[in-house]
Amino acid sequence: MSKVNSEESSSSQKLLKEVEKISEALYVNKNPRGSVAGSNKTPTKPLSRSNLAEPKEKKSFWNWPLRAINHVRNRRFNCCFSAQVHSIEGLPPIFQDLSLTVHWKRRDESLSTRPAKVSNGRAEFKDKLTHTCSVYGSRSGPHHSAKYEAKHFLLYVSLVGSPEIDLGKHRMDLTKLLPLTLEELQDEKSSGKWSTTFQLSGKANGATLSMSFGYTVVGDTRNPASSGSTQNFRSSSNVKQTSNNTGLTRAISAKSSLGNGKSASRRYDHSIVNRESHPLSQNMEEIKDLHEILPAVQSDLGSSVNTLYQKFDEEKVDPANESQFEFDVVTKHIEPVESISHEKEDANALQSELVTGNETVVPFEEIKKAGEVPTAGSDEVGAENFPLEEPLVNGNETDVPFELLKKAGEVPTAGRDEVGTEILPPEEPLVNGNETDVPFEELMITGEASIARSEEAVEIVTEELAPEEGNKISPKNEESVVPKDAEEVMNGEKDLKEMIMKDLESALKSVEMLEATASEDEEDRKKHGDKDKYFITPMKETVPSCSRDVAESVACEFLDMLGIEHSPFGLSSESEPESPRERLLREFEMETLAAGSLFDFSIEGDDPQLECDENFPNEYESDFEEGFDLASLVHDIEEEYQLEAQARVSHPRAKMLEGLETESLMREWGMNENTFQNSPPHNGRDAFHPADFPVKEPFDLPPLGDGLGPVVQTKNGGFLRSMNPLLFRNSKAGGSLIMQVSTPVVVPAEMGSGIMEILQKLATAGIEKLSMQANKVMPLDDITGKTMEEVLWETSPTIDIGDRDHVSERESGDASGFVRGGERRTSFAAKPKKFGSSSGNNNFDSEYVSLEDLAPLAMDQIEALSLEGLRIQSGMSDEDAPSDITAQSIGDISAFQGKSGCVGLEGAAGLQLLDIKDDGDDDDDGLMGLSLTLDEWMKLDSGDIGDEDEINERTSKILAAHHANPLNFIRKGSKGEKRKGKKGRKCGLLGNTFTVALMVQLRDPLRNYEPVGAPMLSLIQVERLFVPPKPKIYSTVSELKKTDEEEEADASDAKKEEKPMEEQGIPQYKITEVHLTGMKSETDKKPWGITTQQQQVQSGSRWLMANGMGKGNNKLPLMKPKLGSAKPGDKLWSVSGSGSKWKELGKMGKSNTHIRNPNVIMPK
């Protein structure tokens, strides 16, 4: 007996000396917080007592006490930030079959996803990373808005196996997600979600990382400096691929009590622990985060004790023992039901006490636990080797150091490592009750318990500890070891657990039937190997029992499925705000979320405990043994069903909106419900051909603007006309064009009767001269940047005074009433309605029309030819010119030499035309300058040219150029018979065949009516025929007003003229051919007013390529190789229509109704 007492006495003395040395070491280190802050460079080997007194580097000015003072007036919120990684898209081919990992780092804590394999430039992730921390907010922002302490995170992607490859790093402050006011953060916006994308760089340049960030407030404290509530936070864990890591481990560290005797702890969840990460750096990070949570002003002694336990944490056993301990203790001595309950247990106390009867275990056992509880075969405890059989110290012999702790107000309560993981050796005796006479009730947690020694496992229950006087800890659910004599009670609870697990299994089976994505998860697990190897979402450990293995496996799969896939946004990265689905979703938000906000909706289907890795305050946690409530599972199923029901209800609404949008577009395009009644089925490229529409059915062209028709007149007498939508039926981008035409003119007959003859005469003038003549005779207004209303407003005065302009031109021009080129304005231009579509007017059914209807009738053919002309200009036509012809220069020979006898003009009218070659005189515009408007041509044809002595040189040129008949063909030459001749024969001076020309310019209404391609010249060949008189449908000619003298003369000769009138008939006009020509300059000249050839090519080719109407040629014209047989130089290209046979060819199903003519090369 004396020997035993002597051994106990020596042991007590030994411990007393040890305590004294520890106290000295603590008081030498004057800045314990600074030492904690500088822990990043601490050596990995266990610390000895000799280096405890060494001061640490890095004494930061902004230390923890100052930060605590700074946060006194701020409000603290415990926020759980989450990062949902969706996918990486657009990866280069070099990443094929490689694996990528996304890292989310906050200070020393780094979270990462499972490796995802790249397939076809895409890597899919289904992982959610969470980080819980304190956020301090104040109302110091503008207008009393909230201002939060920044929480910076680093996001980057690494290549598995080659982490040194930099693919881009992104820094972010997730407090930017929080609402503008603190009240919103506390009330309706306590959670939120935000989706975004990040661009990768380096070798992954061009790839996009899609992620969703969220936050959830799990608790807030008004006065953080005095808060005694316990906060649970997530541990720092590093993911690492190891072949031995087939289960999930849990790292544990003990914490001391802080401030006013109230306990605080940091709980580690189930997470993957990097074996190579040093435990010292993890513990240092824990202390940093603990100071962030509770930045209370502490005494030096309290801080020293805290640092002491931290340093004991660092003195762990070697990694092999640590691994053995974690697997032995956690995986072998924890039941599955207990593992699930541990996820929701309270973490107030750092270690539960071990008492037996009235005998209390001395709290210096914490020193053992701080260095990891030794397993069998491990003798290391802290920095000393204590024998397992060594009895614990007597409480009376440790009064002195603990009274110091008591005076300082710092109670080092026993901190628990892991509930149910403490296995006491059977040989270790407990403290003798006779030797424990020191009252520790004020220092320890009140309660009695006993150690149940079991060789198989330690059973765990939870009991409610009522607060007693002197106890500063709030009443929470505490875990203690059940006495052995309560075995019957525990057996009953075991049965209850098994029943609950059976119910859970049946519920899981029914849920799995509803989950369509369960099979996808199984395939993903097969691809990535062991399902538990890379899981980020916390999972549970299993026991060797086969039945419990099955139950735990089902539970793990279901919980993982809830955490990743049950969120309505879990499988999608949320589409771009500009997409129609996103707009439709936002439109239905207010109906869907009548009782919540947008942020609430974004995580409504998620389990908050799983989102935050179950790091909720204790008031949200409950024990599994008290009853596993399946209401949460049913709630998730009901929410999913409600979402599907809402989608079914929203579908009719979406159809209604689609119908309203279609109706609005049809009104905008001038279409109605009868438009598609006769439409054939769309079964081919040419299904909607103009021939499919009945010719006699009216077809309205789309209007040019609100309240406007399809035709608007321009200031100089030309017109703007919308084009047939069927021409753009193959447009991929839905583009369309409008056509601008100039005032029609009749070109001189001297230029030729056929298209090739006319082109050769035009080419002889050269490209620059021809451009100048065409722009002067047929000018086109520049309407780029103007609206249709502005064009109409500028034209209105012109239309009102059109007739007066015509009269004034007669008076101000030459004696015969003909004025020159751009100086004239005709009454013919005051009738824009005639330029509508001929397919909608039954008046054009006949091939013969009046002179005024010639140009409107030709519009339908010209607009189709103009698109082919645009392709030829841009080099995108499928047809090439059959040949190239060189124009013959007329030299200095007079155009009409030797033809005076044929002309048959008397006096001044018989003068021959002068040389039409350009001699430098600006007034001489060549043959093109002798063109006539339709009104002028009708007057000249009727013989209204004045007296012979009034015919000047220009009139003679015009008559000769148009091959006029002799004047005595229509009158006797006397002055008195001049007017009678006009009445007796209304026309006949000019020939019965002539050519009408007009300029055509295409414009894009979507780009401010800018020109598309270069202007083109349309040539319409007309034939006149006198038909028998019939009821007049059109006004065929413009009659001059009759005077009283004319009426008297007509009355006297009425009988004489009656028979010739009947024989003569009414003149009608027929279109025989329609041609379209344009210039293709190979030099940097200005054809048709376009600045350069490059601009000419780009303006047309850009529109054709954007709308996919360049046919089979995908190359730009500048990229096409030049044929060796092509002759260099400026060219005139041309295409010909079929005149009146247009509709017949359409009925035959021929879509290509034009003919490509040979190119005419202009002389240099």
Swiss-Prot record:
InterPro entries: NT-C2, PMI1-like, PMI1_PMIR1-2_C. One of its GO terms (biological process) is chloroplast avoidance movement. It is found in: Cytoplasm. It comes from the Eukaryota. Transmembrane segments: none annotated. Disruption phenotype: Severe defects in both chloroplast and nuclear photorelocation movements resulting from the impaired regulation of chloroplast-actin filaments. Residues 469-486, 1052-1062 have a biased composition (Basic and acidic residues). Keywords: Coiled coil, Cytoplasm. Residues 37-51, 224-263 have a biased composition (Polar residues). Residues 69-217 form the C2 NT-type domain. GO terms for cellular component: cytoplasm. Together with PMI1, necessary for chloroplast and nuclear photorelocation movements via the regulation of chloroplast-actin (cp-actin) filaments in pavement cells. This is Protein PLASTID MOVEMENT IMPAIRED 1-RELATED 1.
